Amino acid sequence: MFVVYAHRGASEYAPENTMSSFQLGVHMGANGIETDVRRTKDGVLVLFHDGDFKRVIGCEGCIADYTYEELMQFHVKNEKTDTKDIIVKFEDFLRYLGFRDLHFAIELKEDLAEETIALLDRYNMKDKAIITSFKFDYIKRVKELRPDWRIGYLVKEVTEEILSDLASIGGEQLCPQAKYVTAENVEAWHGMGYNVRAWGVANFDLMKNAYDCGVDGMTVNFPDQLISYMVKKQ
């Protein structure tokens, strides 16, 4: 099954990593959601991508500077909307969406394997979720804690070293940047037994190419456009 992962929700149209964005992605027909996990000053896991607040909140600071309650004063911005969306607690996300028939890609932005697995276990997410990161040590730690959990390695261009590292921990998903995806590479990666998910799909041409090359899933800010293209190709 091809998985359309709404990247931080339908983040082209709504403030990223907010309930509005996740809901819109599902409404558009995405069968997967991708999101990012960080930890607050008081140890609460929340969904936030950036290492600081400048881009999406518009001020100085970062998640680790504040308790969860203190974070409620901030609103996540998107230039296409004027909604006042708050930063989402990871557990609230799982409570609201975890029971749905969706795939979940949970990216570790910090070394949070143990805490993330504990919450996912609480909501019976093992068969629905894959834990991913650009940091190899983070996904390696997931496998050390729970070898039965699926992990994905987010990379730019795939190298022999990356393939060797992923194989060494029994990883399931290889996540190359879309601009490096070719049909030949996808075929080779499939031959190695990997599920292939493209990320960094910045425009329609990259989206079209990745889909046509045979990837198994894609992380996109505009799930409606990918779904429309898939329908046309059928």
Residue spans of the language-model regions?
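Phosphate-group recognition and catalysis centered on beta-loop-alpha active-site segments
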Residues: 1-234
